[in-house]
Amino acid sequence: MSTICVYFNFVVYITHTHFHGESNAHTHTIAVKEVEQINHLPLSQSYFKGIQSTPLTNSTIGEYFDFIVDKNPEALAVVVHHQGIRLTYKEFQKEVNQLAMGLLALGVKPGERVGIWSPNNIEWCLTQFATAKIGAIMVCINPAYRPNELQYALNSVECSTLITASNFKGSDYIEMLNCLAPELATCDKDTLNLKALPTLKNIVRIGDEAPPGMHSFNDVINLPTAAHERELKAIGAHLNAEQDINIQFTSGTTGNPKGATLTHKNILNNALFVAESMHFTSNDKLCIPIPLYHCFAMVLGSLLCVSKGAAAIYPGDSFDAKTTLDVVQQEGCTALHGVPTMFISELELSNFNDYDLSTLRTGVMAGSTCPEQVMRKVQTQMNMHQVLIAYGQTECSPINNITETDSSIERQVTTVGRALAHTEVKIIDELGNIQQIGQPGEVCSKGAGIMRCYWNDESKTKATIDDSGWLHSGDLGVMDTEGFVTIVGRIKDMIIRGGENIYPREIEEVLYTYPGIQDAAIFGITDEKYGEEVCAWIQPKEDAVLDEQAVREFLKDKLAYFKMPRHIRFVENYPMTVTGKLQKFKMREQMQEELSDKAFS
């Protein structure tokens, strides 16, 4: 399951109408009382229910988008720095509608799957809202996919159309497509019949060039007629918020990715809740250096900005620390998103102190566990005093837990908050019983954001969402008497050494306090005597010289003997996904192989 730890510091407490209004202190006070009433604080069991009095919006994304445009058509909607593009909401709407009608002209129907395989660019943004307007289900495809992964993604959800970039970071997308489907060289672009991609009827290449068997993006937006405009309006009138609108492939550690299927209602409400958490208004500008294909950027970035009529600022097609801060300063951004490694890279820029980041105040940190020290630096050195802390996963659209501004600083940086509005959260043991307060167990959630299913995979859906509607995260957490949750690791990452349960996060947090350590990853490896032993991979800071024995001496006074790492390795980098998620299973495999080789040498 694709898990994100997203960092917030204000909970969603607003009164929603059909379209959401602004939050205020009065509604916050009411919500605080409601939380106390429905949960009977202090808690004795690890179950917490978010406020229920907040109505959910039942608008479709297209309907809501048009409402925002009508409200403030001349407001800045999107800036794509590397493409030199600046669009107002009225201009953005015009281009979205043109693409939507172009897709209709290609023959795309409501409910069909349209894949987008591209880094961040204006075409990605347009595709997101154009597909929503015609009721097509946008399928987000990882820009790092290789041919076999692309083939699996397209075929598993039966995509009828693929919108693709030409290349990205050394990957030639057009060449890969031709390797998968050599028929493209000779077939008619309007009548595709590809053996390896049997459901694919249209390939649209971003730009003005059309390779054999493909349409160009520019040609598609010039296809519509007056009839397609009438068709667009007719379709919009019959869409509803309960319909599927997005498929996100979860980055599982074993087997093929699963297609988490999300509705208009799922992701629009999640975006609105988080926008309120950030106190977002139409005056805000959010810098989004994270990849749009991921739920983090698509929902908490692009859609979040539209939910409030704010400006979405994209600094580049991929992350670069210097470019990101250049754009934050140049545009006067008020918010910045990123994974922990991005913020670390920004803080470590040699000219970091030369930047004027005074306009920043908030943002979301997500993708992997963030060291407490980094959080504090982001709050103080980057002026992001309202940096947000929350928790969820793709299957939750993606947020289910969120913290509050009036919490202690300690809670803001060490917990992932309490259940979001219209969400229940519980911690359970191996038998499914709710744990007592303070006892670790699996984090489960239930509510408005829970995905409908894994696309065309009933067995995996049932394995993840039980008969009562509870989503089982696979994460280990602990709840306190006020309902605040702390994530202590993954169930699969928990180490059992000689019968003792060891939580990697605890050891990692201790290592983060050692001078010269930039990052630490703790995982278990097989051991004949104890079942498992603790292994540590440590990333030194630039120019730091670390000594294994000195690190062990440091840990000796801070950890019980059974938590001490048996094996320590200093490494330059970790195996990670594009979104910054650690792949501990790869570390484990590599370490086991290394130790096995030593044993037989």
Language model: regions and residue ranges:
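Structural core segment of the AMP-binding/adenylate-forming
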Residues: N24, I30-K33, L106, I134-N222, ...
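AMP-dependent adenylate-forming
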Residues: N39-Q45, Y64-T88, A210-P211
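Conserved AMP-binding/adenylate-forming core of the ANL superfamily
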Residues: T57, E74-F129, R146-Q151, S216-T225, ...
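Conserved pre-ATP/AMP-binding loop-to-beta segment of ANL
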Residues: P73-L76, A196-L200, V204-P211, H215-F249, ...
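Conserved AMP-binding A3 loop
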Residues: R86-K90, G236-N269
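AMP-binding/adenylate-forming catalytic core of the ANL superfamily
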Residues: Y145-N155, L162-S166, L336, L431, ...
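Gly/Ser/Thr-rich phosphate-binding loop
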Residues: I221-N222, Q330-G338, L347-R411, E424
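Conserved AMP-binding/adenylation subdomain of ANL enzymes
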Residues: L268-K285, C295-A335, L349
